[in-house]
Amino acid sequence: PVEINGIKREAKFETVSIKDNIFKAGRVYFCNHLTPNLVWIPEYKSHKNNVSEIAEITVIDCSPLSILKMINKITDNIQIDKQEDVITVKTDDIKISLYDKRSFKERYKNFGEEINLRKEMFGSLTLKTSSFLFLRKINQINFHNLLKFEDENKIQFLLKDYNLILEFIKI
């Protein structure tokens, strides 16, 4: 149940999961909100890190084309851009970039050899934010095993314990 203005209503959704024995990078869950008016409420979407949405998910695989084939089985409502070092899949809501290990390390070269890549994995999550103010306060004192890179357009965190890069871009 969701309570809005003192009135309880039932939020409804459907989920589909793809287990990690099929998609080697990890588990994937899709959630279709059947009552979006009870979920996507502006006052519930704000956070002190000012993140408004997920811009991109990167997946690392020794064969990015095989991942593309799996995505094509899930939906045909996508735009595909194949380049030499990355395959980009765009939906109405998100961008998924498929890399091999070498190309991913090149994109995130600021972290050098600190990136510990597996053959198949989720590599990074790019989030849109309206301000870097809160993010600039985060440092290695706050989080164990964290590396940070910043320029005028983005702030990147390598969370070594989770083997994941969080990238924040300003909108």
Report residues per predicted region.
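Glyoxalase I/VOC metalloenzyme domain signal
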Residues: 1-171
